[in-house]
Amino acid sequence: MATTTTSWEELLGSKNWDTILDPLDQSLRELILRCGDFCQATYDAFVNDQNSKYCGASRYGKSSFFDKVMLENASDYEVVNFLYATARVSLPEGLLLQSQSRDSWDRESNWFGYIAVTSDERSKALGRREIYIALRGTSRNYEWVNVLGARPTSADPLLHGPEQDGSGGVVEGTTFDSDSEDEEGCKVMLGWLTIYTSNHPESKFTKLSLRSQLLAKIKELLLKYKDEKPSIVLTGHSLGATEAVLAAYDIAENGSSDDVPVTAIVFGCPQVGNKEFRDEVMSHKNLKILHVRNTIDLLTRYPGGLLGYVDIGINFVIDTKKSPFLSDSRNPGDWHNLQAMLHVVAGWNGKKGEFKLMVKRSIALVNKSCEFLKAECLVPGSWWVEKNKGLIKNEDGEWVLAPVEEEPVPEF
């Protein structure tokens, strides 16, 4: 295996990943996989059983989070904040899950991801402090995209800081039929912006919008680590990828100084905004976006050019058909599957190169939430499940749904 010396600035896109995507630099491969594993952790920890009073929360607490999701080198990273999003502003049902229990932990909000930093020991070894933000995609399958409005709307809320009332800038009463009459100017998809900027005064967890939570914590962390050469990496898959792109731009525009690198490494990202928004993103020299996309993934082409949307950032196009371990699936959900993409990244040697795993990564991970592996791999489909579907036997001999590891607590 050829060894290269690539600076951390280059890995974060200081040169737009020129010359290190093809052939794929080994350190960049490892960074992409790490970000993908951070994304996967948001799925693995999310309680999606609507019978549970904790549906929509994180199953694991911050202190043991990375251990419980079995992250490689878990001790190198610490979760410092959980993030929450709400559906207050005309968000279609199905994107944020609600518990059917009358004792639900919160009826207006869902856990939406986390902020993590490198540990003191890891930071000392690196000579700098890394800040990671992982935003959760939807736990629903492919059909979620059909219920989310694709209309573009003004990106003006992102051009200045959040409102004093805790909202991110989109006013109450905004609907998915809303559209700006002005066809010019910087625009993003209303659905993506709504999730990012909504707050709900009746919720203890989203009195501040996802946007306001993020900017407040990033400001605090940048001050705390100002002498440790901090960098910010955002990551997300699918819906989470769109929010990571918006948040990366927002942090570069409103939440950090020009000398702090802000990088989004996203997977299977639908289109976010128009050409003018892309120009705004590119105007920030410290802001870089790398989009890992499967060439046959249909969702990365949504909402589409007819509505004025364009690709944003540098595309790193891979092809799941190159892996000899994956079946010839006709399921678009498989083409969009995060673990399948990470599997291909692990063995990617260019469009013309032969697939060969370049890091130690179990192929069984592909089938965590799907059945994309060939039958001869002998790996059951959708194997990441709670024992007994989360039921435990209590002291009275009753089988009941287990509580989460730590009771959710508002953090802002």
From Swiss-Prot:
Induction remark: Strongly induced in response to sublethal levels of UV-B radiation. Down-regulated as the leaves senesce.
Coiled-coil annotated residue ranges, if any: none
Active site per the UniProt annotation: S238, D297, H336
GO (cellular component) term, any one: cytosol
Keywords on record: Acetylation, Cytoplasm, Hydrolase, Lipid degradation, Lipid metabolism
Name under which the protein is recorded: Phospholipase A1-IIdelta
Disulphide-bridged cysteine pairs: none
GO biological process, one term: cellular response to UV-B
PROSITE patterns (alphabetical): LIPASE_SER
Record's subcellular location: Cytoplasm
One MF annotation (Gene Ontology) recorded for this entry: phospholipase A1 activity
Phenotype caused by lack of the gene: Enhanced tolerance to UV-B stress but not osmotic stress. Impaired PR-1 accumulation in response to UV-B.
Presence of the UniProt keyword Cell inner membrane in the record: no
Family: Belongs to the AB hydrolase superfamily. Lipase family.
Domain of life according to the entry: Eukaryota
Cross-referenced CDD domains: Lipase_3
Function: Acylhydrolase that catalyzes the hydrolysis of phosphatidylcholine (PC) at the sn-1 position. High activity toward PC, medium activity toward monogalactosyldiacylglycerol (MGDG) and low activity toward triacylglycerol (TAG). Confers sensitivity to UV-B radiation probably by deesterifying membrane phospholipids.
Modified sites of kind N-acetylalanine: A2
